Swiss-Prot record:
This is Queuine tRNA-ribosyltransferase. Coiled coil: none annotated. Zn(2+) binds at C300, C302, C305, H331. Homodimer. Within each dimer, one monomer is responsible for RNA recognition and catalysis, while the other monomer binds to the replacement base PreQ1. GO terms for biological process: queuosine biosynthetic process; tRNA wobble guanine modification; tRNA-guanine transglycosylation. GO terms for molecular function: metal ion binding; tRNA-guanosine(34) queuine transglycosylase activity. It comes from Pseudomonas syringae pv. tomato (strain ATCC BAA-871 / DC3000). Its EC number is 2.4.2.29. Residues 243-249, 267-271 are annotated as: RNA binding. The active site is at D89 (proton acceptor), D262 (nucleophile). Substrate binds at D89, S90, G91, G92, F93, D143, Q185, G212. The gene is tgt. Keywords: Glycosyltransferase, Metal-binding, Queuosine biosynthesis, Transferase, tRNA processing, Zinc. Its cofactor is Zn(2+).
Length: 371
């Protein structure tokens, strides 16, 4: 993987990631394909939304169907028929999400499989091997996602464990030609975040991610971290904000120098009838859409908006038809990709401030200040 910085506008960056499997223009949003599929989407439909790269879930794919099944097809790209780059998370966040079902030790994490209840162990070495077997283009280190809230002592212990696991991840990654990203932890504590970043810089990674956000903290706490952390990261490496978020969160991350994002929000919200449009969120199951013959979003060029009315989408939602979720997902993912394309163009042209002002004005909101 190579990263080229093409333009800046304030803290915001316009870049390009180049992989053997394709080019990713940044800032970029990656749809989440947890089980080897972006829910409700054919690979050609994902590509048609403008997505250049997707995310796969190491933890879930390891448990089911297992890497032997996937390797029987070649790798995850062959298994799911996605030809572009794939980033895989390490499994750390999913293990964190198991709560009382898991035990964390220096070696790694032992937990009861959510698939069949069997006792399972995963550590840095296992995570690196699974991601190698998946044929990931970007591999994430195995880390512990610091919970929220966490006082400084708890966050320090967690961050230091993640740094030790980062070293083991780097060793286990070995001669794998895929990119390896470190993950900055430390909770909401600036001194710990800075120490985590210093430790990761000493180990050496191809890119760096910001972990431990969007885990229940108030938005102002997340913004506080983003006000200082991306600017401390190496300028010649991509910066990835994990698991975030709403369109507003993407805009605020880009304004502060983040290059890559992923989140289940556009796909999950689509299945619940919450559709993103320029003015905010449209709830398609509301009764007043029953007789609305207008397109979902007249400014959107997706298949859904070009072909179907709000009344039809409302009908599908009320009937529980799977086509409704599919059409909603096509639109939400296209909306996110159009937003990212607009941000890239604005940075390139040096007009990001005007773009951001217009983005918020359409929502009837003031532009938040930059910290």
């Amino acid at each position: 993987m190579s990263f080229e910085l093409l333009a800046t506008d304030g803290k915001a960056r316009r870049g390009r990631l180049t992989f053997p499997r394709g080019v990713v223009e940044t800032p970029a949003f990656m749809p989440v394909g947890t089980y080897g599929t972006v829910k409700g989407m054919l690979p050609r439909d994902i590509e048609a939304t403008g997505a250049q790269m997707i995310l796969g879930n190491t933890f879930h794919l390891w448990l089911r169907p297992g890497t032997e099944v996937i390797k029987g097809h070649g790798d995850l790209h062959d298994f799911m028929q996605w030809k572009g780059p794939i980033l895989t998370d390490s499994g750390g966040f999913q293990v964190f999400s198991l709560g009382a079902m898991r035990k964390i030790k220096e070696e790694g994490v032992t937990f009861a499989s959510p698939v069949d209840g069997a006792k399972v162990f995963m550590g840095p070495e296992e995570s690196m091997q699974v991601q190698r077997d998946l044929g990931s283009d970007v591999v994430m280190i195995f880390d512990e996602c610091t919970p929220y809230p966490a006082d400084e002592d708890v966050a320090r212990v967690s961050m230091e464990l993640s740094l030790r696991w980062a070293k083991r991840s780097k060793v286990a990654h070995g001669e794998n030609t895929a990119a390896l990203f470190g993950i900055v932890q430390g909770g909401m504590h600036e001194n710990l975040r800075k120490r985590s970043l210093e430790g990761l810089d000493e180990i050496g990674f191809d890119g760096l991610a910001i972990g431990g956000l969007s885990v229940g903290e108030p938005k102002h706490e997340m913004i506080k971290v983003l006000d200082y952390l991306p600017g401390l990261m190496p300028a010649d490496k991509p910066r990835y904000l994990m698991g975030v978020g709403k369109p507003e969160d993407l805009v605020e991350g880009v304004r502060r120098g983040v290059d890559m994002f992923d989140c289940v929000m556009p796909t999950r919200n689509a299945r619940n009838g919450h559709l993103f449009i320029d003015t905010g969120v449209l709830k398609i199951r509301n009764a007043f859409h029953r007789h609305d013959n207008t397109p979902l979003d007249p400014t959107c060029d997706c298949y859904t908006c070009k072909n179907f009315s709000r009344a039809y989408l409302h009908h599908l939602d009320k009937c529980g038809e799977m086509l409704g979720s599919m059409l909603n997902t096509i639109h939400n993912l296209r909306h996110y990709q159009l937003l990212m394309a607009g941000l890239r163009e604005a940075i390139q042209q040096g007009t990001l401030a005007a773009f951001v002002d217009a983005f918020y004005a359409k929502r009837g909101l003031p532009t938040p200040p930059l910290g």
